[in-house]
Amino acid sequence: SGHHZBSTBZASZSSKPCCRZCACTKSIPPZCRCSZVRLNSCHSACKSCACTFSIPAZCFCGBIBBFCYKPCKSSHSBBBBWN
């Protein structure tokens, strides 16, 4: 199992940490939290992932960082997100 950190974007997009909904406090350093709900798992860099017991499970990441991850690229192009 070769694990390459510096893989290209062609690797699996879903394994890269990303977040569509992220909010930060105005403190210094900022406290940022991803509020995006994902099905069955959290993003790859999440340390404290919490999931519901439903099927499929709804998971969210409880980590607090001083930055936001880049928005996730979706499989279909939604250009509307950038307006």
Curated annotation (Swiss-Prot):
Gene3D superfamilies recorded: Cysteine Protease (Bromelain) Inhibitor, subunit H
UniProt keyword annotation of Disulfide bond present: yes
Site, Reactive bond for trypsin: residue positions: K26, S27
Keywords, alphabetical: Disulfide bond, Protease inhibitor, Serine protease inhibitor
Disulfide bond positions: C18-C72, C19-C34, C22-C68, C24-C32, C42-C49, C46-C61, C51-C59
Signal peptide bounds: none
Family in the record: Belongs to the Bowman-Birk serine protease inhibitor family.
Protein's UniProt name: Bowman-Birk type seed trypsin and chymotrypsin inhibitor
Organism: Vigna unguiculata (Cowpea)
